[in-house]
């Protein structure tokens, strides 16, 4: 596999999302100026502890409008269409428990409020690239997965981390589609989980993460296609066996385990060379590893025989 050297994101002004759809220009110009405070008043009012913005990860594109992000959603437990946001409001967000188990020294249950209180929360503006060739930029609030793993202490034999989504038949009508291999399960290697970009998300736009976006807690690895990001997580399991994830079980030729973004490797039914920005409809070139190669390319240098791209 040919590994390239990557530069930080950059786009000409003409390709930036119109100001009406994003945060104001002062906020946009503040990106890159250091660690910036998210609005503590807004966060506290919304039930989310205040979090500082980490500007190490510069997205190179303007933030997508909150309205677009919260009303255009893939969440098959609520339906196989994009307009599930209203139906998802029926999913209870409190109480919520995440079980961390498997090959760890300290398996335990975490209440969501416990995680909000004890984990090192920060805001990160990340890109998200869907395998369906659309994309968005979101200010997520959360914590590095590595912080959680440090508490449970993985055994040396652990090789993979598996994420399982809640199954709540009373509020998730999509679960009646019995041909799908519920529950929704995804996974990554322990090395990928320990990477600094791997992020457990509990908020967006300075507010608690809404249910249609995977609230109260989801996972995000911005260099991978979006289907790798488990939503509404109830179990995190460490294992020595590579998991077969939800979409891989359904169609392994189209959706692989690694699912790293690569514009040069098409999906069997469409090109991945470009992506449509949510909200504006603008088409822009897709970047290898979604533009995060400088942080993750070295994870794959010895895996040339693996199908690293979905």
Predicted features along the sequence, with ranges:
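N-terminal secretory signal peptides
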Residues: 1-23, 34-38
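Intrinsic disorder/low-complexity segments enriched in polar/small residues
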Residues: 14, 45-46
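N-terminal export signals
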Residues: 21, 25-45, 219
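Structured, non-membrane catalytic/scaffold regions adjacent to prosthetic-group chemistry
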Residues: 46-310
């Amino acid at each position: 596999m040919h590994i390239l050297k990557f530069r930080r994101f950059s786009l000409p002004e003409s390709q930036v999302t119109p100001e009406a759809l994003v945060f104001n220009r002062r906020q946009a110009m503040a990106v890159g100026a250091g660690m910036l405070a998210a609005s503590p008043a807004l966060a506290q009012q919304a039930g989310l502890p205040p979090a500082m913005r980490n500007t190490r990860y510069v997205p190179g594109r303007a933030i997508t409008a909150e309205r677009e992000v919260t009303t255009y959603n893939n969440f098959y437990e609520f339906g196989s269409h994009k307009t599930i946001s209203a139906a998802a409001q029926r999913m209870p967000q409190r109480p919520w428990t995440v079980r961390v188990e498997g090959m760890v020294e300290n398996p335990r249950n975490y209440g969501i409020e416990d995680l909000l209180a004890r984990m090192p929360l920060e805001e990160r503006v990340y890109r998200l690239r869907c395998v369906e060739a659309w994309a968005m930029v979101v200010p997520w609030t959360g914590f590095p997965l590595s912080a959680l793993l440090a508490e449970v202490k993985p055994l040396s034999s652990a090789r993979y981390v598996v994420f399982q989504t809640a199954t709540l038949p009373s509020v998730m009508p999509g679960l009646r589609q019995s041909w799908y291999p519920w529950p929704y399960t995804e996974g990554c290697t322990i090395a990928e989980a320990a990477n600094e970009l791997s992020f457990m998300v509990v908020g967006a736009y300075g507010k608690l993460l809404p249910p249609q976006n995977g609230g109260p807690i989801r996972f995000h690895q911005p260099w991978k296609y979006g289907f790798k990001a488990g939503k509404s997580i109830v179990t995190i399991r460490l294992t020595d066996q590579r998991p077969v994830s939800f979409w891989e079980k359904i169609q392994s030729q189209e959706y692989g385990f690694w699912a790293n973004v690569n514009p040069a490797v098409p999906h069997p039914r469409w090109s991945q060379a470009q992506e449509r920005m949510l909200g504006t409809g603008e088409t822009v070139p897709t970047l290898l590893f979604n533009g995060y190669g400088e942080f993750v390319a070295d994870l794959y240098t010895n895996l040339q025989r693996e199908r690293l791209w979905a």
